[in-house]
Curated annotation (Swiss-Prot):
Belongs to the pyridoxamine 5'-phosphate oxidase family. FMN binds at R65, T66, V67, L68, L69, R70, Y80, T81, K87, Q109, Q145, S146, W191, R201. Substrate binds at R12, L13, S14, Y15, R70, Y127, R131, S135, R197, L198, H199. This is Pyridoxine/pyridoxamine 5'-phosphate oxidase. Homodimer. The lineage of its organism: Bacteria, Pseudomonadati, Pseudomonadota, Gammaproteobacteria, Moraxellales. Pfam families: PNP_phzG_C, PNPOx_N. Pathway: Cofactor metabolism; pyridoxal 5'-phosphate salvage; pyridoxal 5'-phosphate from pyridoxamine 5'-phosphate: step 1/1; Cofactor metabolism; pyridoxal 5'-phosphate salvage; pyridoxal 5'-phosphate from pyridoxine 5'-phosphate: step 1/1. It comes from Acinetobacter baumannii (strain SDF). One of its GO terms (molecular function) is FMN binding.
Amino acid sequence: MSDVIKDLSELRLSYEQGELYETQVASNPHEQFLGWFNHALAANLHEPYAMSLATASASGRPHVRTVLLRGATEAGYDFYTNYDSQKGIDLAENPYAELLFYWPSLERQVRVGGHVVKIPEQESTDYYHKRPRDSQIAAYISTPQSGKIESRELLQQRFQDLQQQVQSHEVLDKPEFWGGYRLQPDYYEFWQGRPNRLHDRLSYEKIDGQWTLHRLMP
């Protein structure tokens, strides 16, 4: 065993912040999510709306990355990206994904899984025009997203060139290859760290249109 692994094996914390019982949670998992999410916002955490998005290709190879939550209703959880990105390719082949919100200072995490669909085009357009101008420009030049590029300097040059080209444009059209996705949840898991690794885990599963609550082994 290497020294690094040996050192890591000694690193651990005891979770003491809270507890989670069936009698404390909402019957609707989205309401429970909003309660925890608003708590994270009120705690002034750094980007509590950041979430890990896990997708998988048709062959089963997983990919995970951090994206930003841009809408949350009972209908689903929204994020925006380049449709030609790896996540877009995965979702075209296998339209199921999971989100993970992790708030370490609260010793909490939430998993949300389900089917993913594209957001209506007008909603994507409306959101695109709310973005800062330079972020709109960046969406144009970062394509295909995850594609290889020779250097940072070339990326910066393309950005500056497009800035100059559209300087006189009052409004930029949304690129056709860019827009939103909505994860329509059929599964939630709420995790609260507890002492001695006896963590609280409560899951909600959607069965025949109804949410069923279960406690999971830690």
